[in-house]
C-alpha cells in the first residue's frame, strides 16, 4: 500500500514586505478599513473618493492601496483609485466612466 503525502509550501514570497495589518472594505459605508489580525486597532483608512468600493489590492513594497469603485450599476461611472497605505495622497487611476462597475484587482509583481 502506498502512502499519499503532501509537502507544505510557503505561500508568501521570501522576504516579501508586509504591513502586518488586514485591509478590508465597508461596502455600505464606502470605506476602507484596517486592523491588526486579531481585530484590534481598527482604523478608517479611506472615507472619501469612493462610491461602492468593491476590489482591493495592496502594494506594500511601494506603499500603496489600489481599489475599485463600482459606482452606480446602472451608470457607466466606475473608477479605480490609489492612495498610500495610510490613506494619504489619493489619486484617480481610471476616472469615473473609464470602466463599467469594476470589481476585483490583481497586482502583478515584477
What is the predicted role of each segment?
Residues 19, 53, 101-104:
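Conserved positions at the start
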Residues 45-49, 93-98:
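Surface loop/turn motifs at the tips and blade-to-blade linkers of beta-strand repeat domains
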Residues 29-30, 71-75:
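Short glycine/acidic-enriched loop and turn motifs that connect beta-strands
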Residues 16-18, 59-62, 107-110:
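Residue-level detector of Asp-centered blade-edge/turn motifs that repeat once per structural unit
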Residues 12-43:
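An edge-strand/N-cap motif at the start of beta-rich repeat modules
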Residues 24, 66-68:
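Residue position within the beta-strands of beta-propeller blades
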Residues 4, 56-58, 103-107:
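Hydrophobic core register within WD40 beta-propeller blades
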Residues 31-33, 78-81:
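A short loop-to-beta-strand structural motif that recurs across blades of beta-propeller domains
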Amino acid at each position: 500500500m502506498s502512502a499519499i503525502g503532501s509537502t507544505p509550501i510557503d505561500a508568501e514570497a521570501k522576504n516579501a514586505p508586509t504591513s502586518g495589518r488586514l485591509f478590508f472594505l465597508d461596502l455600505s459605508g464606502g470605506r476602507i478599513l484596517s486592523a491588526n489580525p486579531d481585530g484590534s486597532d481598527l482604523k478608517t483608512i479611506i472615507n472619501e473618493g469612493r462610491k461602492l468600493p468593491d476590489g482591493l489590492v495592496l502594494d506594500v513594497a511601494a506603499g500603496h492601496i489600489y481599489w475599485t469603485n463600482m459606482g452606480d450599476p446602472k451608470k457607466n461611472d466606475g473608477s479605480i483609485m490609489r492612495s498610500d497605505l495610510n490613506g494619504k495622497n489619493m489619486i484617480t487611476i481610471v476616472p469615473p466612466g473609464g470602466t463599467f462597475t469594476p470589481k476585483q484587482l490583481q497586482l502583478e509583481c515584477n
